[in-house]
Amino acid sequence: MESSKSPSEVEKSSSASPAPQKPMIRVSKQWVVPPRPKPGRKPALDALGRRKAPIKPRPGPTSALSVEEAKFRVREKQYQDTIGKLQKENNELLEQLEMLQAQLKNSTLDSPKEVEVNSEVVKPDSATTENENRYVNQYNYPVEPPCAKNAVYTEIPIELDPHAFLGDSAKRIRVDSDSKDAKSVPSENGRIRVSMSPQNEINFTPENPAVMEKIRKRGVCNSVEGCLYSGSPKSVKRVRESEETKVYAQLLIDLHKSSKSAPMLKAGPSIAFKLPTMEPNFNDVRPVTSISSSS
């Protein structure tokens, strides 16, 4: 009976005799079976991988300070680099400035001799300078024209400019409606003076010395082209003209219009003007008596 024992009984008897062993976890090829959790608790799983989420340590105050210090050091290094570059450029510019100052001193010391030599060798051409002066005088006008005391010259027609005053040679114009024949008498300076009658004298010369001083300084001003022969701009307000000046200007304008509208009278056939010839005319030669016969 003892020999006929089942193998299960033999195993039980053999296993009961040694020390108890820990249970072993069998590993499969595809997955690992985790141990059974304690009752009443759920494991912290990640929603994406269905695995346990790792717990990251929170950054403490020491780590934040270390990051700020690293950034500050980087910025400080950049600033130091830029300061070094600027100092280097400043030194180079100072050296260039010293070199240029030395060259300028040398050139100022040597320039008077060169100028004297060049002035002796090179001489301006008189013909070219005359042509240039002629061209400049043709298109440039003086600020104060060289004229008589009471003479003012303008480029505007005198009948349209109420501020234009005649000079010493033509101070007065006499107008007489009764006289028909007018005689023109040449004046000393070459201008024509019309003398008809002592009645209705019109004096175009300002007698006020203050007005003459303003004319000399500012020139003749009008509303069309500003102040002629003066450096004052157009925005400067000109002096108000008196009532006499307005009357004189209107009279001149009326005279000009009436001269244009007057009919032209034909006095006869026109005489062609011929230049005088220098050839001798033998018809006008008079006989000359000899001295011997008279004696």
Swiss-Prot record:
Residues 1-19 have a biased composition (Low complexity). Residues 1-69, 108-130 are annotated as: Disordered. One of its GO terms (molecular function) is transcription corepressor activity. Keywords: Coiled coil, Cytoplasm, Cytoskeleton, Nucleus, Transcription, Transcription regulation. InterPro entries: Hap4_TF_heteromerisation (IPR018287). Pfam families: Hap4_Hap_bind. It is found in: Cytoplasm; Nucleus; Cytoplasm, Cytoskeleton, Spindle pole. GO terms for biological process: intracellular iron ion homeostasis; negative regulation of transcription by RNA polymerase II. A motif (Nuclear export signal) lies at residues 93-100. Component of the transcription regulatory CCAAT-binding complex. Required for the reprogramming of the cell for iron use. Down-regulates pcl1, sdh4, and isa1 underlow-iron conditions. Component of tha CCAAT-binding complex composed of at least php2, php3, php4 and php5. Interacts with crm1 and grx4. This is CCAAT-binding factor complex subunit php4. It comes from Schizosaccharomyces pombe (strain 972 / ATCC 24843) (Fission yeast).
